[in-house]
Amino acid sequence: SNSYIGGLSDGFYIIIDCVDDEEYMGFFCISTKTLVEPQWFSVTIADEGIGINELVLVEDMDAGFGYVDRFGHVVIECQYDWATPFVEGVAQVGKWIDDDYYEYYIDTTGNEINLMMNSFTQHQLLYL
C-alpha cells in the first residue's frame, strides 16, 4: 500500500492510503494532534474553514455521507446520498426514501432544522 498526505486545509491534512487500487481517506488535525486513519471514500473540509464545534464531512462507499468530529468520532452516521460540509452549524443533506428524493438542512446533532426544502419523485428528476 502507498500513503500520501494532501494539502493543508484549515488546520487539517488529508491523509490518503492506496490499497489494491482503492483510495481511502483520513485526516490529521493539527489543533487536536489527532491522526484519523484512512477509512472513507472521501473527506471534505469546508472552504470557509471549520469552527471549533464544526464537523468533518466523510463518505462511506456503501453507507453514504456522514460527519465526524476533529478526533474522528462519528457524530452523525453515514446515511445521506448527498451532503455539504457544515458552515456555521448548518449542513444541507439529501436522501432517497423509496422513489422520492428529499433535501433538507440539519444541525450538528443531525436534527432537521426546518421543513424539507425540495421533494422530487424519481420521474421528476429526469427533467431537471
Regions from the language model: what does each represent?
Residues S1-L128:
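Residue-level detector of conserved, function-critical positions
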